[in-house]
A protein has these predicted regions:
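Cyclic nucleotide-binding regulatory module and flanking cytosolic helices
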Residues: 1-38, 77, 82-83, 87-89
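Glycine- and acidic-residue-biased ligand/ion/polar-headgroup-sensing regions
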Residues: 39, 50-62, 79-80
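Cyclic-nucleotide recognition modules
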Residues: 23, 73-130, 137
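Short phosphate-coordinating micro-motif centered on Lys-Gly-acidic
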Residues: 42-47
Length: 226
């Protein structure tokens, strides 16, 4: 994680996502641009709320941990996506864990600055309301809904989300992947073998490579995590 002191890039993101119409100049002075590497955590469930993050480049993975210690994936997010908005409104600790799937760029502003300079700003409040409403509107695609799908669909969707680009390859820990999509190591291993036999993916030296992205899309029907 590092702060990017690039005023040109900062302005480009503000214009691209029409954030100049949301944040007034005094508030913009409290916004900073940050870069996170692939696999880096933006926040963890239970962390003390501190910032509102706005994803302006890259992809995020959002997952949660149950009381029993099991970790399940909830969804993947693309720009423009807010992290920490619900926590700001509810004044609660972070409710989910958020990880960078690719290199990501995020705008960041402290909750204190929001409270001090935008507590009653209708533009900011409308922006937050729209984002939170959309999250609740799409809640039908939550964990319980995902688990209704066969493991084949869940795995195909997961691979499409974490392996970006055609013929992309990555080293995936099958135990972690199985936990995230809510199945066993043995089951996910069998499904991966089936995908290999169908020529959809290749597994070699611990890495999985997508060979037939369209074939995986057919199995996924639609990507249930995005």
């Amino acid at each position: 994680m590092e702060e990017l002191h690039d005023e040109s890039l900062f302005s480009t993101y503000l214009k691209a996502h029409e954030l100049e119409n949301v944040f007034h100049q005094k508030l913009i002075s409290h916004v900073s641009l940050w870069r996170y590497e692939q696999g880096e955590l933006i926040c963890s469930k239970g962390d003390q709320r501190e910032h509102l993050y706005l994803l302006v480049k890259g992809k995020l993975k959002i997952f949660t941990t149950t009381k029993e210690g099991k970790t399940f994936i909830l969804c993947f997010k693309h720009p423009l996506e807010a992290i920490g908005d619900i926590e700001y409104v509810q004044q609660t600790d972070m409710v989910n864990t958020v990880e960078a799937v690719t290199e990501v760029h995020m705008l960041r502003i402290s909750h204190q600055a929001l409270m001090r300079h935008a507590k009653d700003d209708p533009r900011v409040l409308t922006f937050l309301l729209k984002g939170i409403t959309n999250k609740f509107y799409t809640k039908s695609n939550d964990l319980s809904f995902h688990l209704l799908y066969p493991v084949e669909v869940r795995l195909a969707s997961y691979l499409l989300s974490v392996l970006t680009g055609d013929n992309s390859a990555s080293a995936l820990r099958l135990t972690d992947s199985a936990s995230l999509i809510g199945t066993s190591y043995r089951h996910i291993n069998r499904v991966i073998q089936q995908f290999c036999e169908k020529g959809l993916i290749e597994r070699r030296r611990g890495k999985i490579t997508i060979l037939d992205r369209e074939g995986l899309l057919e199995i996924a029907e639609r990507n249930i995590y995005e």
